[in-house]
């Protein structure tokens, strides 16, 4: 299966945005975008001025990389979002936020979405009491996500939970750290997303 092979730090520098792809490192002075706030490459310090299409494309690429998706996956989410009731941009972001790997990340069981995706694939979580190992599994409001009993001593999970207060838990999620369990209480609102995303640019790009 195809996947991103570029350094996470290079991705953040290319997008000129701290996307917290390296977990704890992003909160320290070792963060690459803090030390070198310009694109990677020989001519990185001279940023290119994009056309209207270029701005739309960069926004799509940024969100794809933020959630770790490939083009076919992302386009599929857009088509489902445009077919649903409501604003296409809001629908798109809600679908991305309610992916199981993202929910695991938001609950604080992993430092990054990429790590959350690996943990899900390795069968460390159960959804409403049933083990699920599909990162794209769509979580619904009222759903409980729990670390399986034998995985509660996994160092990556316990260490991530120790620093969850620094990262914060969104309002649409409740977390019981002692029980290694979280619940999606409602559908996330646009206001719950703190990352600077201009979803309308993505809608305009795909609408052409």
UniProtKB/Swiss-Prot annotation:
Residue ranges constituting the S4 RNA-binding domain according to the UniProt record: 98-161
GO CC list: small ribosomal subunit
Matching PROSITE patterns: RIBOSOMAL_S4, S4
Single annotated GO MF: rRNA binding
Entry-linked Pfam families: Ribosomal_S4 (PF00163), S4 (PF01479)
Keyword annotations of the record: Ribonucleoprotein, Ribosomal protein, RNA-binding, rRNA-binding
InterPro entries: Ribosomal_uS4, Ribosomal_uS4_bac-type, Ribosomal_uS4_CS, Ribosomal_uS4_N, S4_RNA-bd, S4_RNA-bd_sf
GO biological process, one term: ribosomal small subunit biogenesis
Record-linked CDD domains: S4
Family matches, as SMART domains: Ribosomal_S4 (SM01390), S4 (SM00363)
Function: One of the primary rRNA binding proteins, it binds directly to 16S rRNA where it nucleates assembly of the body of the 30S subunit. With S5 and S12 plays an important role in translational accuracy.
Subunit field text: Part of the 30S ribosomal subunit. Contacts protein S5. The interaction surface between S4 and S5 is involved in control of translational fidelity.
Entry protein name: Small ribosomal subunit protein uS4A
Lineage: Bacteria, Pseudomonadati, Myxococcota, Myxococcia, Myxococcales
Gene designation: rpsD1
